[in-house]
C-alpha cells in the first residue's frame, strides 16, 4: 500500500498512515478511544472498559444507548461486535456479527442513535448552507 507521506513528514501524517509507513500494528485501545470520541454525542454513555483487558489486538467498549440498553462491545481488526448485554461483561455464548464501523453497529441497536446522528448531519449541512459553502 502506498502512502502519500515521506518518513520525515510522519508527524504530519494520520495515525493510520504512520502505522502503514512504519509497518506497525494498531493499538486497539487507541482505536477504541477514537471510536468513543466519534459517536459519544449520539448515545447516553460510552467509554473504553477499564475492567476488561485491552491491548494491541482487542479492546472493549461499554455503551448505553439513548433507549437505556447497555452493551459491551469488542473491537478487533475484524470490526466491532456485541459481546455482552451489560457493562464489562463478556458472554462467551453470545453469537453476534461483526460490523465494519461503529455507525453500522449502533444503527442496528438504537433508533435513538439513528435519530441523533441524522439530526447532527442535518444541522451541519444547514450550517454549511448558511455559510455559503
From Swiss-Prot:
Q: Can you supply one Gene Ontology CC term for this chain's record?
A: cytoplasm
Is Phosphoprotein a UniProt keyword of this protein? no
Where it sits in the cell: the answer is: Cytoplasm
Q: Note the Pfam families from the entry.
A: GSKIP_dom
**What InterPro entries does the annotation carry?**
GSKIP, GSKIP_dom, GSKIP_dom_sf
Which UniProt keywords are listed?
Cytoplasm
The record's GO molecular-function terms, alphabetically, read:
kinase regulator activity; protein kinase A binding
The reply to whether Oxidoreductase figures as a keyword in the UniProt entry is: no
GO biological process, any: regulation of Wnt signaling pathway
Q: What is its main location?
A: cytoplasm
Protein family: Belongs to the GSKIP family.
Query: By what name is this protein known?
Result: GSK3-beta interaction protein
Species for this entry: Danio rerio (Zebrafish)
Amino acid at each position: 500500500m502506498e502512502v502519500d507521506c515521506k518518513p520525515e513528514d510522519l508527524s504530519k501524517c494520520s495515525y493510520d498512515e504512520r502505522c502503514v509507513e512504519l509497518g506497525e500494528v494498531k493499538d486497539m485501545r487507541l482505536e477504541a478511544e477514537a471510536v468513543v470520541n466519534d459517536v459519544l454525542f449520539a448515545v447516553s454513555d460510552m467509554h473504553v472498559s477499564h475492567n476488561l483487558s485491552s491491548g494491541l489486538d482487542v479492546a472493549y467498549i461499554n455503551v448505553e444507548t439513548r433507549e437505556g440498553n447497555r452493551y459491551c462491545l469488542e473491537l478487533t481488526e475484524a470490526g466491532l461486535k456485541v459481546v455482552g448485554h451489560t457493562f464489562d461483561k463478556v458472554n462467551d455464548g453470545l453469537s453476534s456479527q461483526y460490523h465494519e464501523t461503529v455507525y453500522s453497529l449502533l444503527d442496528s441497536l438504537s433508533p435513538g442513535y439513528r435519530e441523533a446522528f441524522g439530526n447532527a448531519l442535518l444541522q451541519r449541512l444547514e450550517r454549511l448552507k448558511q455559510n455559503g459553502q
